[in-house]
C-alpha cells in the first residue's frame, strides 16, 4: 500500500514536471524570473547541487573498488547508482537553463580547446561512460542470474543489461570472471578519480574564472566545490543506507564509519568557508564586500544561518555525536546535510548578482528584466521539483528491477585472496 502511494505521488510530481518543462521549451526563457543582470538562477543551483552529489558519491565508491576499504562494501553499488542518476539530474537542469537546449550538440562538434566549458563537456561524457562501465562489470553476474530467475519486465530489463553475458557453469570460470570484473572495476575507478575531480572541480572553475564576479573569482572556488561534493556524497550515502540500505537498528559499524567521514568532510568545508568569509569581509572595496554582507545580514540571512550553518554543520555534527550509532539519528544527520546543501549551492550562485558593477546601474533603467534581484517564480519551482521527481522515479523503478541495496557483502577477490581492510578511526 505504501509502495503504491509512493509511486503514485512520484508519478504526479513527474507529470507536473513534464508539463512545466513543456511550457519552458515552448515559451523560452521568458517564463522564468531571470533578468539580464541575474542570468543564473534556481536551475543552476540544482545543476551544481546534483553534479556535486554525483562526484561525491562516485569518489566514495572508489574507497571500495580502488582502495579496498571493505567496510564500505555495502554501499558500493548504491554509490555508483546514485552517482549516475545524480549526474543525469544535473545535466537535465543545465540543459533546461540553456537558451537553445536543442543546440547542446554544438559543444561536441565545435570544440574550443581554450574553453573550460568545452573541456567540462568532454569530462561529463567520459565520466558518464566510466560510471556505466563500472556498474556493468559490478552487476553483470547479477544481471545474468536475474535474467534467468525472474519473469516479465524484470527479466527483459536484466537480460538487456547483460549485453549477452552468461554466468559460467564451472566455479573455476566463475571465479576467473569475478577476478576480471574486479580488475576492470579497479582500472575504471582509478581513471574515474581524476575524471570526477575534473567534473566538479571543472564546474567550480567555470565560476572561479569569472572576473566580473569578485565573489567567485578565486583559486579557492574549485576546491570549495570539491569538498562540498564530498560532504554531500557522504551525507547522501549515510541517509540512504540508514533508512533503505539494510542498516542494523543500532551499532552498525558502517554507519559509524560514514558518520566519521561526514564529520571530517564538514570540518574541512567549515575551514574553507571561514577563510573565504574572513577575506571577503576584510575587503575594503564596498561593492565586493556587499555580497558577503548580503549573505550574512540581508533579507535572506536565514539561508546561510539556518540552511548552511544550522543544517549542514551544527545539526548533523550534534546528531552524529549523540547518536551512539543509532540508525534513526544517523539517517537524520545525513538528511539534514543533503537538504542543507541546497542552501549552500544557493549561496554559491545567487548572491553574486546582488551588487551592481558600478553605482547607479541598478536604477538607470526601469524594467523587470533589468533588476539586481531574483526570486524563482512558480514555473521555475514546479519544473525543478518535477524534474527531481522524474529522476527519483527512474531511480526507484531501477531499484525495483535491480538489486541496488546490498543486504549482504559483495564477493570481490584479488587473485583468489581477500582484499585487505583499511579502517577509518574516529
From Swiss-Prot:
Membrane topology according to the record: Multi-pass membrane protein
GO cellular component annotations of the record: plasma membrane
Domain of life: Bacteria
Molecular function as annotated in GO: oxidoreductase activity
Main location: membrane
Compartment(s): Cell membrane
Gene3D superfamilies reported in the protein's UniProt record: Formate dehydrogenase/DMSO reductase domain (1.20.1630.10)
Alphabetically ordered keywords of this record: Cell membrane, Membrane, Oxidoreductase, Transmembrane, Transmembrane helix
Reaction catalysis annotation: selenite + a quinone + H2O = selenate + a quinol
A Pfam family of this chain: NrfD
Enzyme class, UniProt record, top EC level: oxidoreductase
InterPro entries: Electron_transfer_protein (IPR052049), NrfD-like (IPR005614)
Membrane-spanning intervals of the chain: 5-25, 40-60, 78-98, 119-139, 187-207, 223-243, 261-281, 302-322, 330-350, 385-405
The EC number(s) this enzyme carries: 1.97.1.14
Task of the protein: Component of the respiratory selenate reductase complex, which catalyzes the reduction of selenate to selenite. This subunit probably receives electrons directly from the membrane quinone pool and transfers the electrons to the iron-sulfur clusters of SrdB. May be the membrane anchor protein subunit of the complex.
Similarity comment text for this entry: Belongs to the NrfD family.
Subunit structure: The complex is composed of three subunits: SrdA, SrdB and SrdC.
Protein name: Selenate reductase subunit C
Amino acid at each position: 500500500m505504501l509502495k503504491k502511494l509512493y509511486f503514485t505521488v512520484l508519478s504526479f510530481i513527474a507529470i507536473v514536471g513534464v508539463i512545466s518543462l513543456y511550457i519552458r521549451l515552448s515559451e523560452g526563457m521568458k517564463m522564468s524570473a531571470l533578468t539580464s543582470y541575474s542570468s543564473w538562477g534556481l536551475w543552476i543551483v540544482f545543476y551544481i547541487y546534483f553534479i556535486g552529489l554525483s562526484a561525491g558519491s562516485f569518489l566514495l565508491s572508489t574507497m571500495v573498488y580502488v582502495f579496498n576499504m571493505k567496510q564500505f562494501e555495502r554501499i558500493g553499488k548504491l554509490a555508483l547508482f546514485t552517482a549516475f542518476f545524480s549526474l543525469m539530474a544535473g545535466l537535465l537542469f543545465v540543459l533546461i537553463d540553456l537558451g537553445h537546449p536543442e543546440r547542446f550538440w554544438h559543444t561536441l562538434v565545435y570544440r574550443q580547446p581554450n574553453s573550460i566549458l568545452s573541456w567540462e563537456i568532454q569530462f561529463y561524457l567520459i565520466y558518464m561512460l566510466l560510471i556505466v562501465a563500472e556498474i556493468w562489470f559490478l552487476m553483470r553476474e547479477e544481471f545474468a542470474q536475474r535474467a534467468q530467475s525472474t519473469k516479465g519486465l524484470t527479466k527483459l530489463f536484466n537480460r538487456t543489461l547483460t549485453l549477452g553475458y552468461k554466468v559460467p557453469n564451472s566455479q573455476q570460470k566463475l571465479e576467473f570472471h569475478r577476478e576480471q570484473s574486479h580488475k576492470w572495476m579497479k582500472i575504471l575507478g582509478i581513471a574515474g578519480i581524476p575524471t570526477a575531480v575534473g567534473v566538479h572541480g571543472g564546474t567550480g572553475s567555470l565560476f572561479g574564472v569569472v572576473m566580473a564576479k569578485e565573489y567567485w573569482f578565486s583559486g579557492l572556488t574549485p576546491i570549495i566545490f570539491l569538498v562540498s561534493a564530498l560532504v554531500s556524497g557522504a551525507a547522501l550515502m549515510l541517509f540512504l543506507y540508514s533508512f533503505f540500505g539494510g542498516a542494523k537498528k543500532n551499532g552498525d559499524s558502517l554507519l559509524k564509519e560514514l558518520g566519521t567521514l561526514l564529520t571530517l568532510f564538514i570540518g574541512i568545508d567549515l575551514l574553507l568557508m571561514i577563510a573565504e568569509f574572513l577575506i571577503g569581509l576584510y575587503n575594503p572595496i564596498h561593492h565586493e564586500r556587499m555580497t558577503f554582507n548580503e549573505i550574512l545580514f540581508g533579507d535572506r540571512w536565514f539561508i546561510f544561518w539556518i540552511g548552511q550553518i544550522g543544517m549542514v554543520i551544527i545539526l548533523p555534527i550534534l546528531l552524529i555525536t549523540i547518536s551512539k550509532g543509532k540508525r534513526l539519528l544517523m539517517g537524520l544527520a545525513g538528511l539534514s546535510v543533503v537538504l542543507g546543501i541546497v542552501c549552500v549551492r544557493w549561496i554559491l550562485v545567487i548572491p553574486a548578482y546582488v551588487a551592481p558593477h558600478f553605482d547607479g546601474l541598478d536604477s538607470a533603467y526601469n524594467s523587470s528584466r533589468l533588476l539586481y534581484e531574483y526570486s524563482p517564480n512558480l514555473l521555475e519551482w514546479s519544473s525543478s521539483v518535477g524534474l527531481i521527481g522524474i529522476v527519483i522515479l527512474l531511480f526507484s523503478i531501477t531499484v525495483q528491477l535491480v538489486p541496488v541495496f546490498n543486504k549482504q557483502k559483495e564477493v570481490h577477490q584479488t587473485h583468489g585472496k581477500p582484499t585487505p581492510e583499511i579502517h577509518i578511526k574516529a
